[in-house]
Amino acid sequence: MKLSHLALVELLQKAYSAERAAAFAYIGHAGSLKAADAKMAVKKIEDDEWEHRENILRLMEQYEVPISRAYEVRFYVIGKIISASCYVIGRFMPFFFAGKLESGNVCEYFRMMQHFHSLGIREHDEMLYAMGMKEKEHEVYFLEQIKTDRLLPLFERLFSWGSGKTANDVNLENKIPVGNSDQYCKPSDERR
């Protein structure tokens, strides 16, 4: 079945390429860290990003969505630049910006689910839910690493993400079940 839902096609293409950029960034991030446990944690997050990319590719193949060459090139370059920069920008910024990025990524998967639902397709709910929750776990991990850093209040004000600010409405302590999770990541006027 070929998708004719342009917003969903674009979201799949962008997410597919952005997952590779994130994985590249985490290679540099892990490499720049000194503590073995932190290196392993970021490496695990990198592995999750590669797995998400594979899952998205399967969806794209199932619905005949072509890979966007433009996104692939753009996000390849972005990922490599971020990866290299991790070695020179200190400890705080890679954790902060990774957390901010993951915060936005959470909603990608719930928006995909909403778009699929608009087409009457629910067979991917479990996978999309799991990927959205995994991105939230990543966000929480990165914030935990910098929660006491003296730079956090300044960066939180400048970039609208941190201890009191997030780009999604997912709460790992009070998860909405998969069957109702299309409530996540809607504009506030659409939430019930």
Label the model's feature ranges:
Residues 1-192:
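Non-heme di-metal
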